[in-house]
């Protein structure tokens, strides 16, 4: 099972009107395919504790795609990144075949710095759901082109072979 870590960095350079307790960055970490069973297994092997318990905010996401009760990473990632359901295998496109805007793109439009980090290919479905609009998660080279044309400030991940 691949676990994907996605980080969204949003430095808030708003100025003096900013409250002192406003965070400088927001980091969203997604354990792709990770559920309660995987968390429990981690707890059982580590004296019934995980570092997740130390995080100030954690959450779970229960999703299903438009066409299936069992979602895939593309549809789940699109739902998380864009706030709208789509079909399995589809990234950043809704049921009306319209391109969706992700939270990362909205932050870019508002002057925030953004980044993605993946411990798998950076063009895999979950990280790609934050920048790609394409009808198949398997079109890796086209997804790589969309990443290279994006305004993402920083990205790290595998998948060099897809950037021709």
Please give the residue ranges for each predicted region.
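Sec-dependent N-terminal signal peptides
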Residues: 4-13
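N-terminal catalytic scaffold of extracellular/periplasmic and nuclease hydrolases
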Residues: 18-164
